């Protein structure tokens, strides 16, 4: 092993014997009281020197060679150390290098830090609905390294669908599904496979019928939409494990007996021109993509048993908790 301090973390010296690794308080580490030998060792933890070489560096600097072992142990325990032999060399043509570096900072297990994007590459995600929200979600997921991103949308692109990072004006009149398939990379080894997760980003209605079918088939799914001046991401439904959209409706009906009639009319009579602020749509799309990626990367997103909601004009998100409803039955077998 040739130890390497994580190259994505800043290294700043607070004084000659104190070094801070990382600027974000969630994972920053401060080492203090370092002597000349330890300082020399730290400056040489660069993925080139192995442990015997680091011990020799400590000795030449007038320190105890065992200081190298202690320093490596501390850094490894803090989760800021990589094995330089297993880190891919920096490639300026690697478009996913910033994403790989970011995710590796969130992952504790050293094995996962070595190739953090592997789970994304294996995944297949389908986005249903390719308006202002769904089109951006699809492109973000593809750009973040998801192996296969497919789009299902039977409509044609209109000027109102155009948004930065999604569909463009040159797509006007082209089927939305076709316009996006032209810009989404296709993984040959994943053609025809069922999706690991489906994102429901309806351009009209509430997508409840799709959600029911996906729940029945055991397919994880996430809802992302704008309702007038509010954006809602969630729930992320893990069939048999977390609350579903019907659970949410039952909780609402407990408080508002007319809620089922409201939902039925919202599904059956979508507005001709739905309000969808472009900045709100972008925020919803980004949040939805983040939660999909978090799920694929092995985290538990806040949209499991919950929704993340944001509203104009300020876009400050808040989480609402939605536990499984006892009358729903979607988790009874769990």
Question: Which residues does each PLM region occupy?
Answer:
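Adenine nucleotide-associated cytosolic modules
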Residues: 1-334
